[in-house]
Regions:
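Sequence-level preference for short, compositionally simple segments enriched
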Residues: 1-189
Length: 189
């Protein structure tokens, strides 16, 4: 019988690959990559947001609280983010366990590289790719400029299909100086 460390390592590698496959599938079904905007006209300008907006970024995986172990396994695997219980039921009958990563560095150095190496398989892959584009703009500190904010809004409006394009255009038109109509604000790339 072989009892070398190589056998143990091979078993661990196989288990890791199985877990990674499970994780990618789980995020395909239950994960979300989101970009949002928070209006902060006064406070934002004091903190370098000349646009009056803060760009919010988040990766989240949600499950019913009975499955909290799955969400905690994901947190343990990545080693970043946090797990919390969300008591908002919305369309659910139970509390929700939510794993989320909001930290820019954690997203750029852990989450994005993982899903670039192990791609998602559903339409969520497109949302991830758009999310990664936005995060790269943010990492270059271009999100604090009008041009960068507009670029992120243009990308974000193609994600998740929750906010209609017109709403994002209105937000930018109303709060971005020197623009007179939506054609001046959002241009296709």
């Amino acid at each position: 019988m072989i009892t070398s460390d190589n056998v143990i390592s091979a078993d661990n590698q196989q288990e890791r690959l199985v877990f990674i496959g499970w994780l990618v599938g789980f995020v395909d079904g239950e994960g979300c990559f989101s970009i949002g905007f928070v209006k902060q006209p006064d406070r934002g300008k004091r903190h370098g947001y000349s646009t009056g907006y803060q760009v919010m970024h988040r990766f989240v995986v949600t499950q019913g609280v009975k499955s909290i172990n799955s969400v905690e396994e994901i947190k343990d695997f990545f080693g970043v983010g946090n797990v919390r219980i969300n008591h908002r039921h919305d369309n659910h009958k139970e509390d929700l366990a939510q794993y989320s990563v909001n930290n820019e560095r954690d997203l750029l150095e852990t989450i994005i590289p993982f899903f670039e190496k192990y791609p998602l398989h559903t339409a969520k892959r497109y949302n991830f790719e758009q999310f990664a584009k936005c995060m790269r703009i943010i990492s270059q500190h271009r999100h604090v400029t009008h041009e960068g904010l507009i670029q992120i809004a243009e990308i974000a409006q193609t994600m998740n299909h929750r906010k209609p394009r017109d709403e994002l255009i209105r937000i930018l038109r109303d709060y971005t100086p020197n623009t007179s109509n939506s054609e001046d604000i959002v241009q296709s790339t």
